[in-house]
Regions:
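FIC/Doc superfamily catalytic core
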Residues: 2-17, 22-27, 31-33, 40, ...
Length: 323
């Protein structure tokens, strides 16, 4: 059905149809748990055919309770971050250096998704060139990713860059869908960013039980919003990345999207984005497989930790040392 012929219902009608209170429907709309919902002033336009949203509060039985970060000491990382956070002046250098992290971020992310795009190709694209071998879709993904991460950096602040108004916590189910829609800008502008229609084993369920992707995303965001906020940001963002890779909510550009979401979460806590260069992607895949099979995040977290330490050291170099 095209956008011009889409029919909508209001909150009261949806509440009656789904057997929920109007207040609960508004909350689910604001959290992004209603497919295709559109904000209309103070109200919400809900597609007539939208399925009843899953409520994370009622899905605790399938939450992933097997996530294990392992023993670790983040004193070195937090010390670097603290030093960087009190740095004054030189906002221009921080922005330039942050932008320089994006080509290796993208080259590695594409490699993670099985696409061979070199660091130099991305750098050339961002310098205004048209590098051979890049498709239009790949170019748009590069530009859209840059937009998402630069916007997140401006909203949440980074080092001497002051934060603007932003949500706390920064991510939500609605925000993730909005990020994915931005990622698809110019590629699929008609997408409602609905979850793929599939059922997969849940991380915390015993036996061989499977649950729809929509249910698993609801419980993932419930855990993120209610249970993981007290965790160290590196652990929380790593759990988010691992679960997004397990669920693969949209079915396209899964690795890139999961790494973008992790980067946004890290930025909201005052850290730069994680940068895993293409040559370390085999290590990332191996570490990720441990999280899927055993819930063991220790190696994955250590990989991301070393990446953040390198990025923080770059961001704190003297201006004259940067070439």
């Amino acid at each position: 059905m095209g956008m011009a012929t889409m029919q909508y219902m209001n909150v009261r009608t949806a509440a009656q149809k789904w057997g929920l209170t109007e207040r609960r429907v508004r909350i689910l709309c604001s959290e992004g748990r209603v497919d295709g919902v559109i904000r209309n002033g103070w109200g919400w336009n809900i597609p007539i055919g939208a399925p009843k949203p899953q409520d994370g509060r009622r899905l605790r039985r399938i939450k992933n309770i097997g996530l294990r970060p392992g023993a670790a000491n983040y004193a070195a990382l937090d010390g670097l971050k603290e030093t960087f956070s009190v740095q004054k002046d030189d906002q221009g250098y921080v922005v330039r250096t942050f932008r320089s992290l994006l080509p290796p971020f993208l080259s590695g992310s594409f490699c993670f998704d099985g696409v061979d795009i070199s660091l130099r190709q991305v750098e050339s694209l961002f310098e205004g060139g048209f590098p051979a071998g890049l498709t239009q879709t790949q170019m748009l993904l590069c530009f859209n990713t840059r937009t998402i991460l630069l916007r997140a950096m401006q909203e949440t602040g980074l080092g001497p860059i002051f934060a603007g108004p932003h949500d706390e916590p920064y991510l939500s189910e609605r925000k993730l869908k909005r990020l994915y829609r931005t990622l698809l800008s110019g590629i699929d502008d008609l997408s409602l960013c609905e979850y793929r229609k599939a059922s997969i084993p849940a991380g915390g369920a015993g036996g061989y039980k499977v649950f729809p992707v929509s249910q698993q995303m609801a419980i993932l965001m419930y855990q993120y919003e209610k249970e993981w906020q007290s965790l160290h940001p590196l652990i929380r963002s790593s759990f988010l990345f691992g679960e997004l890779m397990r669920i693969r909510p949209f079915g396209s550009f899964d690795g890139l999207f999961a790494l973008i979401a992790m980067g946004c979460e890290l930025l909201s806590a005052g850290y730069p984005v994680e940068v895993i260069p293409a040559e370390r992607i085999p290590e990332l895949r191996a570490d990720l497989s441990l999280t899927q099979k055993r819930g063991n995040y220790q190696n994955l977290i250590a990989l991301f930790e070393s990446s953040l330490e390198r990025s923080l050291q770059l961001l704190m170099r003297k201006k004259e040392e940067h070439v």
